[in-house]
Amino acid sequence: MAAASPSTSDAAERLARLVQRLRRLVRGELILAGGHARLQPQDETDVATALELARELAVPVRFGGVSGGLHAVLAGHADSSRGGLPGLQIDASSHLTRAARFEGTRGMIEVQPGVRLADLNRLLQPHGWWLPIETHPESGATLGGLVGLDAVAAAPAWGTLADRLLGIDAILDDGTRQLFGPFGERSSVSLNSGRAGQLVSSLFGIAAGVQADIARHWPPGQRVPDGYLLDAFHPRPQRPYTPDGSVNLAHLLAGSAGTLAWSARLHLRLLRRPAVSRWALFLQPSAAAALTHAPAVLALQPSAALLLDAADLRRLLGSRHPDDQALCRLAGIGPDMSGRPDGTQQGEAGPAAWLVRFSGEADADVQAAHRRLTALLDPRRQESTTGLALQTGGGLQSHGRAAAGDVQPVWQVLLGERVSPTSPPSACIIPLLPQDPATLAGLISALDERLASQGVQPSWRGQVAAGELQLVVPEGAGPKARQALAATLPPRWTPALREAFVEVRRQFDPTGILLGGLMTARH
């Protein structure tokens, strides 16, 4: 067996000292496994103590047990050289699971980071509210993890979790506690330490230095998984995070994937649950052909607009659940994936499909939206053009609930997978950073052509409304696909913005101990 490197040996010794001290100082459980330690804190004091000692001993820290398997691109260029060193994982999912201060009249609630999304929405359902994030039914995603990702809703009007944040009670890398919330003359938020005051002053300075870059180059209405939400300091009319366009410092923590601070308590603004939702499926000859309709589809303001690939369609066709069977019948799709609109032929890239939902308070309005969508995507379709009313728990409202046992409808699984992907990036599944939906058709056509010239047959899937697609290629074609992406996609950030992201990270975590959540990193 090879001897451990000096750096690894030193890190293991520092971790052992940390664990020894934590056992005397915290109430939560400490678990040692695989050369790492995991703390399941009983309260926020445990977290503050652990962070303060980890910084003192230079032990890397990850925030785990909060993402429900959801992957993220880590922001701020965390130090990958520390990634393999023995470290501490802080896991909120066991004990920090309380929801409090629910205001049913105004739709506001305070939660700890370990609260599961499914549990929260189950609690809110009788009151007519929900947090409009939809994940895989079995993901177990928690609020801390979803805020760390700035998880996106299926409908553009519902925004991302940053749009739902009123404030975050945060714990910084040295154990300092600070409420990140509205900032300004009308705000009641006070900076309760010298560290917090210096940090906030530095952040405003960083944002001021890139104000022109934000105005010219910031992608409106999209997540920023490869940076930090510096546009929170310079709200724009087309995408304000707050109703009055003021600065809320909590938005900077959204999407930071655990690289800036621990989110101890989340103050959330909820959304009224829509009274009616209807779904429809439309077969298209290819992803590129489907995406030519993206601007027109999104102009109809759907509450979900998903692009499915041939593998997704096979899953729907193979399902025994009545919801899935009804969707395929409505689209006129047979086992051979026949049923393409007149005048189209199956492209070499294989068929694709739109899976679209409209939601609202009046069923007549929702049905009218589906009729307009049908006229756009499949004018041949004469009957059942008003969509299917599918319940979240499965079963068809419009056709009566058929016995399906405990089988999960595939459409519901696809909704979670496409809106909040649970499969980490791999050699064959490559997530694109968010793009302007209006440009997707041209981008996908260019990439398809480039990949086809190299003998690679791609497929595409994802959430079109958010501009977030996954490129799926055959095994072994991943390197070619990544090269094609690098050659085709334009630079996302200016040098000044990239440097600003690094400086934000340094101001929050000058010693570089916060390595983010237990998610796949991209550096």
Region locations from a protein language model:
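Intrinsic disorder at enzyme termini
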Residues: A2-A4, T8-A11, L15, L489, ...
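General beta-strand structural signal in soluble alpha/beta enzymes
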Residues: L30-A33, L39-P41, P60-G65, I90-A92, ...
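Glycine-rich N-terminal segment of FAD-binding domains in flavoprotein oxidoreductases
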Residues: L30-E103, M108-P113, W129-I133, Q454, ...
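A generic structural signal for well-ordered alpha-helical segments
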Residues: A54, A58-V61, L124, V297, ...
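Beta-rich nucleic-acid/ligand-interaction surfaces
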Residues: A72, E138-V147, D312-L316, H321-D324
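FAD-binding subdomain of flavoenzyme oxidoreductases
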Residues: A99-A100, A118, P126-A289, T511-L515
